[in-house]
Amino acid sequence: DSSTSRGLGDVYKRQVEVTVKANTTYQSREGKVVVKAGAARTSIPVTQAARPEPSADPDITVPEGYRLVWNEEFNKGTQPDLDQWYYETGENGWGNNELQHYVAGNQGNEQLAAIKDGILSIIAKKIGETVYSIRMNTKESWKYGYFEARLKLPKGKGTWPAFWMMPKNYTAWPDDGEIDIMEEVGYNANYVSSAIHCKAYHHSIGTQKTGETFLPTAQTEFHVYALEWTEDFIRTFVDGKQLFRFDNDKANNRNTWPFNAPFYLKLNLAWGGDWGGAQGVDESALPATYEIDYVRVFQKK
């Protein structure tokens, strides 16, 4: 309840109802509710409880020294939870001359981001004369942590699946940084790679820092792709084996290390483009499906 005064001795009570979005993280949130009545103004501190931590879940392995702060197991509903994710949409080539049109979950009656039996399927499909697909991002962002996803990659020349990160406060590429945890292109099947991009190191000038490995079952079995990101280094892993490492040169120069700000996670399946379509595309591979079992985020205790 809130009370306001209207003249001498006149006090009126009003009930105020505040609606907020669910807290999908494992950390409480602090905020304020400001109540105004005429010239009167009251600020009320509020705390939103954290989501209960599933620390007792035997299926979640927590890296030593870390704690779970966010996860998506894709075990509820038939489409991604829009309290945790949002779609990027459009057909502008995305700076890579990609051929697909990204949509918000569906194209007409076709469901292109579908959850079934605990698996999210991102589907690239030709409908009419256009290939449609999905690009989705977490609403949360994090500075440092251990990030992992269990993925099965699509088949076919022209496919370009990715699991990556971009800065929350993005102004320019590559100055603000990019972290590619996992990428693969269909014409080079089962070769998975990781990379970072920044002003000093990026593919446009041939200086990108990258690592690659051959994973013969990348398109037929699920594998765990992970990133450990600290103030000192960026490391990626496939099934616990290190794939790539990039160290902070400690020069205090964002041209070589812009990775000291919050980044958010991205999942997408591109079709064609400068890399994905470098050897052409094979439309007989469509529809192509990129499968995601889970996405988890851990931060140091």
Give the role of each language-model region.
Residues P52-K301:
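GH16 jelly-roll
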